[in-house]
């Protein structure tokens, strides 16, 4: 539901990403939430009356993540806007793709298949303007049979912030969790074009990127927080400095927690 313009309410949240200035989804007392199984009420938390509840994706019923608030970009919506206006119901197609059609793992590949049946196809235009500048790091590929083509780009001057609502909605619909605009755009393009992508923090790269097979017993903590023991057949993307290289991600599968 919506709130009257100018109406102020006090809500207590212990979420890890709760901070001043962010936009959140607010459920007022009496609201029934699909991911909570009960009505929201007023509660007293540490002596402060909380008039409602700021919501995580799980509580709102749009995703599995329940450890933090659903976070909107600054000025995405005027405070008090009913969420249904910005987050309409989705229709999601769940498709099983056979291994011989990796092109159909992306939206564009599916659209091309439908185009062959007579449906209209509008190819998305690439608005990116890239300059051929020297990179501040190197690239080495030790396992060309596993990565015959590896492309690196370099972006600077970025402001890390929540993604636009339309992109967050698309990622949630595809079963992914929005993180921030930098991570989300790589996942969005991956879903669109079936091309695995990852954004690396330059601080973790060192002298450059090394694509190699994992060493026996090598371990990697992935983005989902799981510590994994790697197999020598696993292809890893590592940051290297001198003779040492540390895995930053499992190629084509998942990035590392520190990457």
Features from the language model and the residues they span:
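RNA/tRNA-interacting regions in translation and RNA-turnover enzymes
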Residues: 1-259
């Amino acid at each position: 539901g919506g709130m009257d313009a100018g109406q102020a309410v006090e809500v207590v949240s212990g979420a890890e990403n709760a901070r001043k200035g962010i936009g959140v989804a607010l459920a007022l007392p009496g609201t029934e939430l699909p991911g909570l199984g009960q009505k929201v009420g007023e509660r007293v938390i540490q002596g402060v009356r909380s008039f409602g509840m700021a919501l995580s994706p799980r509580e709102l019923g749009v995703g599995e993540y329940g450890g933090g608030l659903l976070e909107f970009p600054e000025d995405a919506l005027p405070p008090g806007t009913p969420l249904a206006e910005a987050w309409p119901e989705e229709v999601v197609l769940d498709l099983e793709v056979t291994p011989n059609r990796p092109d159909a793992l992306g939206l564009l590949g599916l659209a091309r298949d439908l185009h062959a049946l007579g449906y209209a196809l509008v190819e998305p235009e690439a608005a990116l303007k890239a300059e051929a500048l020297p990179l501040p790091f190197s690239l080495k590929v030790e396992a060309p049979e596993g990565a015959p083509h590896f492309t690196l780009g370099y972006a600077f001057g970025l402001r890390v912030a929540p993604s636009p609502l339309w992109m967050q909605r698309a990622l949630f619909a595809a079963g992914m969790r929005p993180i921030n605009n930098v991570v989300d755009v790589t996942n969005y393009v991956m879903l669109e074009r079936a091309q695995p992508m990852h954004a690396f923090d330059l601080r973790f790269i060192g002298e450059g990127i090394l694509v190699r097979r994992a060493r026996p017993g090598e371990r990697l903590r992935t983005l989902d927080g799981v510590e994994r023991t790697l197999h020598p057949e696993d292809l890893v993307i590592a940051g290297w400095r001198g003779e040492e290289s540390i895995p930053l991600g499992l190629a084509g599968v998942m990035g590392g927690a520190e990457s």
